[in-house]
Amino acid sequence: MLYYRNLALLSLLSLSSAAPSQVERSPDAVFKPRAVCTPTAGGSSSIDDVPAIRKAISSCGNGGTIVFPAGSTYYLNSVLDLAGCSNCDIQVEGLLMFSGSTEYWGGKTAMININKINALKLRSLTGSGVIDGNGQNAYDLFASNSDYERPTLLYITGGSNIEVSGLRQRNPPNVFNSVKGDAKDVTFTNLRMDATSRSDNPPKNTDGFDIGSSTHVTISSVSVSNDDDCVALKPGCNYVTVENVTCTGSHGISVGSLGKSSADTVQNVYAHRITMIDSTKAAGIKTYPSGNGHGLSTVKNVTFSDFNVRGCDYAFQIQSCYGESASYCASHPGNAILQDIIVKGFSGTTSGKDDWVVADLNCGARGTCDVSMSDFSVKAPSGKATVLCANTPSSLGVTCTSGASG
């Protein structure tokens, strides 16, 4: 019996040793809270708060949280570089007000620079946070000097896992948001964006989003009021989703322009549930023709779906002679490759600027025009609808009238 009792005891010990043992960890290692920093505002537009913000990033940028409280105003008189902010959470609940100095900002690339940063959140949890580019002086100067170089409000180059959400962006001197440099997994959501001039000089070139060389960019639940492209899909962008977006006064959701001086590609774009108000077009593709140093443009797998058109000049437009005259393109036809382009679910009414014309599809005579249209019910104010076409396939899906241009 003693033998069997010892054997049972050994079996229990063996089972106990085989089971995973609990590892002791210090509470700090498991539940260590994020460091939280609140920059000290100078309280005057004559005091640049960027150094104080940089100090907060130095202290809390690595895995911490930086808070700009509701009701606070921070004056930014120089470029805000977010370098050092890795896996950090920047919460803007107050106002970030940039200076209107055309002297300082002339020639600058960015007002907020996000360069090769991974895991960054720039957001407002309450929806009260505002980033103001204070662009009025730039609008006025650019009206008299088109060579004046203006900065982008938020400039993302490279990096990954970047979220911009819940904010109001207003009055950038130039583009609101730019993404390039092979950035990956960038999300813009729940943004209110408006560029408004207080003078007769419009806020020129205030694209809502310029999406360049990047992969997996999402733009959702955004409203944009501006004076240029709502979303510009630039060379090198791949896998872009644009959804639940309302644009007013813009140039629409635009692929391009492509092929100005090099071979350019845009591919895998899905834009759906878009409301386009008082814009030059709801959606379109812009490519340069052949010759004169222009490169080959390739646009693949792009879907424009469920667009509500309200007072736009065109619902859909293809320009294969962008940047050149009609006489030039007669001898140097467009050669862009448009492959698997789907336009479906468009409804609403155009502005009537071009009488009954609701779409203008000028595909290149030497290119590929793999475009299909379905459930397209946009009409002119008169109730009639004409789609102008050139070099489009017989399988297009709508009745064409010759005479397309652009």
Curated annotation (Swiss-Prot):
SUPFAM superfamilies: Pectin lyase-like. Residues 1-18 form the signal peptide. GO terms for cellular component: extracellular region. Pectinolytic enzyme involved in the degradation of xylogalacturonan (xga), a galacturonan backbone heavily substituted with xylose, and which is one important component of the hairy regions of pectin. Activity requires a galacturonic acid backbone substituted with xylose. The gene is xghA. One of its GO terms (molecular function) is polygalacturonase activity. Belongs to the glycosyl hydrolase 28 family. Its EC number is 3.2.1.-. It comes from Neosartorya fischeri (strain ATCC 1020 / DSM 3700 / CBS 544.65 / FGSC A1164 / JCM 1740 / NRRL 181 / WB 181). It is found in: Secreted. Pfam families: Glyco_hydro_28 (PF00295). One of its GO terms (biological process) is cell wall organization. Its main location: secreted. PANTHER family: ENDO-XYLOGALACTURONAN HYDROLASE A-RELATED, PTHR31736. Glycans are attached at N244, N301. The active site is at D228, H251. Keywords: Carbohydrate metabolism, Cell wall biogenesis/degradation, Glycoprotein, Glycosidase, Hydrolase, Polysaccharide degradation, Repeat, Secreted, Signal. The keyword Membrane does not apply. PbH1 repeats lie at residues 183-213, 214-235, 237-257, 299-320. This is Probable endo-xylogalacturonan hydrolase A. InterPro entries: Glyco_hydro_28 (IPR000743), PbH1 (IPR006626), Pectin_lyas_fold (IPR012334), Pectin_lyase_fold/virulence (IPR011050). It is an enzyme of class 3 (hydrolase).
